[in-house]
UniProtKB/Swiss-Prot annotation:
Highest taxon above the source species: Eukaryota
Protein name: Paraneoplastic antigen-like protein 8A
UniProt feature, compositional bias: Polar residues: 261-270
Organism: Mus musculus
Annotated Basic and acidic residues bias: 219-228
Gene name in the database record: Pnma8a
Upper lineage: Eukaryota, Metazoa, Chordata, Craniata, Vertebrata
Length: 430
């Protein structure tokens, strides 16, 4: 093995085991079969007279097929006095170590370099970080890491500020949540109170007093929850006025339907005719504003078989018409031929035409009046007024049928004593 390779191996081995190179030796040329005791026995004759020593480790070199041993000597042993070669078992053993003169030359060159750069050995040790435990600084001198200390202090202050800010924000959020919940409760309570006041008007005083007790500035802070409810205050006499207005609004004139009495008295029918005449007079006095709201009454022409008939009390007729009403045969003749009863017939028709017809329910009633009988008059006077024909089959039939029917179509009605005259089916449809 060459000397530079052996020196490199010694430096690497000392650095790996943490040994001082100035006290270490590398012994090469030891045979492979040589034991540890035999190595120490051979070294005792060379190193023991110079001082104590210790064999630290051994290694096998494959290229040379020999062993190498790392030996540490005690302090005070001069390495220059150790021989570089000595005889041993299996051949010549060689010794490799650091020459002290080499170190002196290196140190001389290093000092010259540091002086030229303006550096010292302490600067080199600090830069190379060769001393893991630096000496404590003097208390009188300021600390060299004052910037780091200031940064730590500022970091602690910033953390405290952030913590306080977070606490203040959490408190504000809790207060806002409580205010929002209170506002929602008040709004719900106000809505329920309004509903109860609408149902029970007597509760307006309690609600008004409750709203008076509330703070006026309270609703200004709840802009996000909509408009505040208006205070409900009950005024004296408000309930009476509301009822009066309600009565005025609901006041409607409903038509009174007069129903025919089902009795058999003659006076009841007579009173009914008078009441109808009174209603016609009242309806004639209705103002135009009311008439405008009602639908116009339209008269329709009817056929001969469905003419309008008017029942008339015989007492209201003139005396000239009474003898003609004794029998139904005379009645039919007077209606068809237009005999001497035409003036009375015209009078009755004009009285019926002056009446404003009131929509009444037509019923078939049989009233027994003893020997008296009603006179069925034809209301032909109403045909003189303008009539509006309806479109349809009924209107066409009404136009096609002539107004004057032949006398053969009418049949004399048979009457029984003490009973009503028999009325044809066409006359009952009234």
């Amino acid at each position: 093995m060459s000397e530079p390779v052996a020196m490199t191996l010694l430096e690497d081995w000392c650095r790996g085991m943490g040994m001082d190179i100035h006290r270490s030796l590398l012994v090469t040329g030891i045979p492979e079969y040589c034991s540890h005791a035999e190595i120490e026995e051979t070294l005792n004759g060379v190193l023991l007279p110079l001082g104590t020593y210790r064999v630290l480790n051994k290694i096998f070199l494959r290229q040379e097929n020999v062993k190498a041993a790392l030996v540490e000597v005690s302090e005070g042993v001069n390495l220059s006095s150790i021989p570089r070669e000595f005889p041993g078992r299996g051949g010549v053993w060689r010794v490799v170590c650091r020459d002290p003169t080499q170190d002196d030359d290196f140190l001389k060159n290093l000092n010259e370099f540091l002086d030229g750069e303006g550096r010292t050995w302490e600067d080199m040790v600090r830069l190379l970080k060769l001393n893991p435990n630096p000496p404590l600084p003097n208390s009188n001198q300021p600390p060299p890491n004052w910037a780091e200390a200031l940064g730590l202090l500022l970091g602690a202050v910033v953390q405290v500020i952030f913590y306080m800010d977070a606490a203040i924000r959490s408190r504000d959020e809790e207060a806002r949540a409580e205010e929002a919940a209170e506002a929602e409760l008040m709004e719900a309570w106000a809505s329920t109170a309004r509903k109860r006041v609408k149902k029970e008007p007597g509760l307006g005083v309690e609600v008004g007093s409750a709203f008076k007790m509330e703070d006026r500035n309270y609703w200004k802070n709840t802009e996000d929850h909509g408009d505040p409810p208006k205070p409900l205050v009950r005024r004296p006499g408000g309930k009476i006025r509301s009822r009066r207005r309600k009565q005025k609004k609901n006041l409607k004139q409903e038509p009174i339907c007069w129903r025919k009495s089902q009795g058999s008295n003659y006076n009841s029918n007579y009173n009914k005719v008078n009441l109808e005449a009174g209603e016609a007079a009242q309806s004639s006095e209705i103002p135009e504003s009311v008439k405008s709201n009602k639908k116009p009454f339209v008269k329709q022409e009817e056929t001969v078989w469905k003419k309008k008939r008017v029942w008339r009390d015989p007492s209201d007729l003139p005396r000239s018409a009474l003898p003609a009403a004794d029998s139904p045969g005379n009645l039919e003749d007077s209606d068809q031929d237009g005999g001497p009863e035409n003036p009375a017939k015209k009078k009755a028709m004009t009285w019926a035409s002056n009446k404003i017809p009131v929509p009444t329910r037509k019923k078939k009633k049989m009233v027994s009046l003893g020997t008296l009988s009603y006179v069925l008059l034809d209301a032909e006077a109403t045909k003189n007024k303008t009539a509006i024909l309806k479109k349809g089959l009924g209107a066409r039939r009404a136009v096609s049928v002539p107004h004057d029917a032949p006398a053969s179509t009418s049949r004399p009605q048979k009457t029984k004593l003490g009973a009503f005259p028999r009325v044809s089916k066409d006359s009952r449809k009234l």
